[in-house]
Swiss-Prot record:
Protein name per the record: Regulator of telomere elongation helicase 1 homolog
One annotated GO molecular function: ATP binding
EC number: 5.6.2.-
Gene name as annotated: rtel-1
Stretch list, region Disordered: 818-896
Chain's role: A probable ATP-dependent DNA helicase implicated in DNA repair and the maintenance of genomic stability. Acts as an anti-recombinase to counteract toxic recombination and limit crossover during meiosis. Regulates meiotic recombination and crossover homeostasis by physically dissociating strand invasion events and thereby promotes noncrossover repair by meiotic synthesis dependent strand annealing (SDSA) as well as disassembly of D loop recombination intermediates.
Organism: Caenorhabditis briggsae
Any GO CC annotation of this UniProt entry: nucleus
Cited NCBIfam families: rad3
Catalytic activity: ATP + H2O = ADP + phosphate + H(+)
């Protein structure tokens, strides 16, 4: 729905707070925003599940910004004082003032492309003037070619710091010379900016966009950033994020639990330790050599001993001294030796079926402390490593290409991760509240929530430290002074387990309904095929009867589903194995002429998700092109893969979502085995006040979270519709709360045959919607192809670029999907005729109703036998009342202009003309009471709530067809003039006659 911020609707949530929303919100949006306002008032946290397509992002932005605006108005003097402090003001402001000014909003999402969409949504609202910035790495922002040509992000950072310290970056120097007022003048556009906007402004003004965005974050009211910038202690430290008195929003938070655990985990190899030792030796040798050269220089320049002394440290990087390097080198040597001893000791136990050994996390802390690195010394340890890396890179012309500081970087990151997770204040936060504080501050308390795992590969050790408590990361945020944490997603279910594991103080847990009371989704659990029950176990992948039944089920659904079908498998290996069997196995009798795979390819254009990310754009393009073809397309993909998240499949692209099997995590994966071991250990502990989650429940929850995320592809907005097919009998025994609340009432069980019948009936009832979506999808594809051509033409300047290098984020990002602004055509004012019961007056006979241009039907085949074939085109002309059209083969030269047929009252079929003359007062005569109620509700909805004409068409179709098609056609008189022509054209297309 396109909205104009100037025409926003004021929504009162309670007696104190109103929200300016771009349009009249649906009930589910009101409920969502009320929950946000309530927890902000109470200074509590929230877990908010709302189905995809219900305006979750818009509701989050409008409600939080409205609440902050109200607070700002109540403290105008404090806010004005803070804002006038200028760049760096957040650091200079006294704590007392800091506590009194408005909270900063941190809006986090998984990827930068998702954040681009947040910017797009924000600019639809009246809150677009709020001072906003977006944070990202140099990889996204930097415009200095010396840095851009470097691929590794860590090296980019070190090279950038070196250029900045030497004043060798023109873009940074110009940024550094900017006054605060000038910077604000450059960046103030009257609306929020995404990364592309920052880079464009930076390039135009030769000013570093990376540092501009970071500086703006010091005084911004809304900061957009990826998850890990908030969760990862190293990133918080790097970007100097001040979380005190802030509101932190995690959008798309369904994966947040695993992300929190991952960011509190760490990995290091003995190879990295050995490389770190070699790099430290190299730095030490270079440093000693430089000191010797400095002494010789001093001896040559000074006649009297001691009369002129050179401060050697000023010739080197600040604080980098040979004695520090030698002490550090000794500690790393000891660490390498202690890890070898630990692996051979009985402190680690074997963990079948894994090859390595494991123990509680406390063993790692003990090993690090015995190596001279504990919580008190780690800061200095890491600082020396960082200085050594910068020094090594500053000598890059003198060192080999392999000596880039990667080993030192790995050791530094490992230590920071461990001790950021195990700082004493964190231990105090995550300890049980019923235990005395003195007993909670020991970092070993935190280590009980972690597992150390070491394995040996080809004689080299791999040390992994797994954190299995997401609450550690969340409570670390609260310890930093975060005021509220809001977790939102379309799929948080099963939500009770999710909220338990996050460990926050939830004031609201919402499982929201869909915007539509009757969700236009058909969900079928297929329990049986021709040969029996469908159980997608690992063993059944080799069972030819099971694989055949799954293949037959897919074919039947593909045959009865129009447009696009998404098929999700549990894993790449499952998908590959089943496809391989389908390609070899004949369908039906042994003498059947075609295999399962051949039949699928005849039914739909098939695309398969690749393992390599760089190949995904081409596969995505093949699928979208296939969807617009007569038989449609099917995309085979995997749960938790690149397709199941992060890509928006709208309307025609996801008429059916099929899930084959249940996507349980790999049972022999190291993290899975150790997580289950950790949960089993918790079940045996008697010192816990709350009953922990069992390993069985966690394992099932992980699977269904992936299922629900894939299911979310089927509905993307209020006018969307589709089917969900779950091919596995085990879904039938799942508890209802494992599925999203909005889906539960749509689920039924059936066998393969009945599933196909129900699917066919479902889409037959929505035939007119499907026809309309075809033309809409073609328009969308035209814009997408134009965007794709623009991206391709931009890359053509570099002969090394290839189409496979263009990512999905390039092709389908909000930036590339922007539509050129067209001249706005004001609709004719609507006149109300008091003599009639019509809501809108009938347009005059001179109002011409334009029929769509029929585009050239281009042959999609790429192999053309001769050039003359290229000139043979077919054109379709349509006359009023005959929607089938006639094919006319042209000569060798196509027409220069496309023909346009205009539809007027005079050119309509006679019966249509008669129907349009029926007074609107006749529409409800003889109508049943129920139909009258539905009719009135439809008119009110159309007039008051921006109901789409397609929905009006569908509702009126149910009332008047097949009994009174003349009244159905006459109903077009109650529509706005711009919708009336579409209504009549749809009626002609469906051959509604009498």
């Amino acid at each position: 729905m396109v909205s104009n911020p100037s025409s926003s609707t004021e929504v009162w949530i309670n007696s104190k707070t109103s929200i300016k929303f771009p349009f009249e919100p649906y009930e589910c949006q009101r409920i969502f925003m009320k929950n946000v306002i309530d927890v902000l008032d109470m200074k509590l946290d929230a877990a908010l599940e709302s189905p995809t397509g219900t305006g979750k992002t818009l509701s989050l932005l409008c409600s939080t910004l409205a609440w902050v605006q109200k607070l700002k108005e109540s403290k105008p003097m404090d806010f004005a004082t803070w804002q006038s402090s200028g760049a760096g003001g957040a650091e200079k402001t006294e704590d007392k003032l800091k506590n009194s000014f408005i909270p900063t909003i941190f809006y986090a999402s998984r990827t930068h492309s998702q954040l681009e969409q947040v910017v797009h949504e924000l600019n639809r609202t009246e809150y677009k003037w709020v001072k906003t910035t977006i944070l990202g790495s140099r990889e996204h922002f930097c415009i200095n070619q010396k840095v851009k040509k470097i691929k590794e992000s860590n090296r980019q950072a070190h090279v950038c710091r070196g250029l900045v310290s030497k004043r060798s970056c023109h873009y940074y120097n110009k940024f550094d010379a900017l006054t605060t007022d000038k910077a604000n003048e450059i960046l103030e556009k009257g609306e929020a900016m995404d990364i592309e906007d920052f880079v464009k402004i930076g390039t135009q003004n030769s000013i570093c966009p990376y540092f501009m965005s970071r500086q703006r974050s010091e005084t911004a009211e809304l900061i957009l950033l990826p998850y890990n910038y908030i969760i990862d202690p190293k990133m918080r430290r790097r970007y100097k994020l001040d979380l005190k008195n802030s509101i932190v929003i995690f959008d798309e938070a369904h994966n947040l639990e695993s992300i929190c655990e991952s960011n509190a985990s760490a990995e290091l190899s003995s190879t990295s330790i050995a490389l770190c030792i070699e790099e430290l030796k190299k730095v030490l040798a270079l440093l000693v050599e430089e000191e010797e050269n400095a002494r010789e220089e001093a001896d040559n320049e000074t006649e009297a001993f001691g009369t002129q002394k050179i401060d050697l440290t000023k010739k080197l990087i600040e604080n980098l001294r040979t004695e520090d390097l030698m002490a550090l080198l000794e500690k790393v040597f000891t660490l390498e030796e202690n890890f070898d001893k630990l692996f051979e000791s009985d402190q680690l136990k074997s963990v079948p079926p894994l090859d390595g050994k494991a123990s509680d996390g406390a063993i790692l802390l003990e090993t690090l402390a015995n190596s001279g690195c504990d919580g008190n010394s780690v800061e200095r340890f890491v600082d020396v490593l960082r200085d050594a890396i910068s020094y090594l890179l500053s000598k890059n012309e003198e060192v080999s290409l392999t000596e880039k500081g990667d080993g030192m970087e790995s050791v530094a990151d490992f230590l920071l991760s461990i001790y950021s997770t195990h700082a004493q204040e964190v231990a105090a936060a995550v300890g049980d509240e019923h235990i005395k504080l003195a007993d909670r501050v020991d970092p070993a308390t935190v280590a009980r929530n972690c597992k150390l795992y070491i394995r040996k590969d080809s004689g080299k050790l791999v040390i992994k430290y797994f954190c299995f408590q997401a609450s550690i990361s969340m409570r670390m945020l609260k310890m930093r002074g975060v005021r509220n944490v809001l977790l939102a997603s379309g799929t948080l279910s099963p939500i009770q387990a999710f909220t338990y594991n996050m460990g926050l103080n939830f004031g609201a847990i919402l499982e929201n309904e869909h915007a539509l009371k009757q969700v236009p989704v058909l969900t079928s659990i297929v329990t049986r095929g021709k040969h029996g029950g469908l159980v997608g176990s690992f063993q059944n992948r080799k069972n030819i009867e099971y694989v055949s039944d799954v293949g037959e089920s897919l074919i039947r659904v593909m045959e009865t589903t129009p447009q696009g079908v998404l098929v999700f498998f549990s894993s790449y290996s499952q998908m590959d194995e089943l496809v391989e069997v389908w390609k070899k196995t004949k369908r039906g009798a042994s003498d059947s002429p075609e295999t399962f795979w051949e039949k699928m390819e005849k039914t739909k254009k098939i695309a398969v998700e690749p393992r390599a990310k760089e190949q995904l754009a081409a596969v995505r393009l093949r699928y979208t092109q296939g969807v617009s073809e007569p038989h449609g397309a099917a995309l085979l993909a995997v749960c938790r893969g690149k397709v199941s998240e992060g890509i928006d499949f709208c309307d025609a692209e996801s008429r059916a979502v099929i899930i084959v099997g249940i996507p349980y995590p790999p049972i022999h994966d190291e993290r899975v085995v150790l997580k289950k071991m950790y949960l089993d250990d918790l079940m045996g502990r008697k010192d816990l006040t709350n009953e922990p989650q069992s390993s069985r429940d966690w394992y099932q929850m992980e699977a269904f979270r992936a299922v629900n995320q894939a299911i979310g592809r089927v509905l993307r907005h209020k006018n969307d519709f589709g089917t969900v097919v779950l091919i596995d009998t085990r879904y039938a025994s799942a508890k209802p709360e494992m599925f999203p609340k909005w889906l539960r009432n749509t689920i039924s069980r059936c066998d393969s045959n009945n599933c196909a019948l129900k699917t066919a009936r479902f889409f037959k009832e929505r035939g007119h919607l499907i026809e309309n979506s075809k033309s809409e999808y073609i328009k969308k594809q035209a814009k997408t192809c134009k965007s794709f051509r623009q991206v391709k033409s931009q890359s053509a300047s570099n002969p090394k670029d290839d189409i496979t290098d263009i990512t999905l984020e390039d092709m389908f990002s909000p930036a590339n999907m922007k539509i050129e602004k067209k001249e706005k055509i004001e609709p004719r004012p609507i006149k109300y005729d008091s003599s009639s019961s019509s809501v809108f007056s009938l347009p005059t006979n001179e109002d011409e109703l334009k029929v769509k241009k029929w585009e050239q039907e281009n042959d999609s085949q790429t192999n053309v036998s001769s050039s003359s074939d290229l000139n043979k085109r077919k054109y379709k002309a349509e006359t009023p009342g005959n929607s089938s059209g006639q094919h006319v083969v042209s000569g060798s030269e196509p027409p220069k202009k496309r023909k346009m047929v205009l539809l007027t009252r005079e050119t309509l079929p006679e019966k249509y003309q008669n129907a349009l003359n029926i007074p609107t007062s006749e529409l409800t005569k003889g109508m049943s009471l129920d139909n009258q109620k539905q009719f009135v509700a439809t008119l009110k909805g159309y007039k008051a709530t921006n109901m789409e004409w397609q929905e009006v068409f569908q509702r009126l179709h149910q009332i008047f067809i097949p009994d009174r098609p003349d009244l159905f056609i006459s109903c077009s008189n109650i529509l706005r003039s711009e919708d009336k022509m579409k209504y009549i054209r749809r009626s002609l297309g469906m051959k509604i006659n009498y």
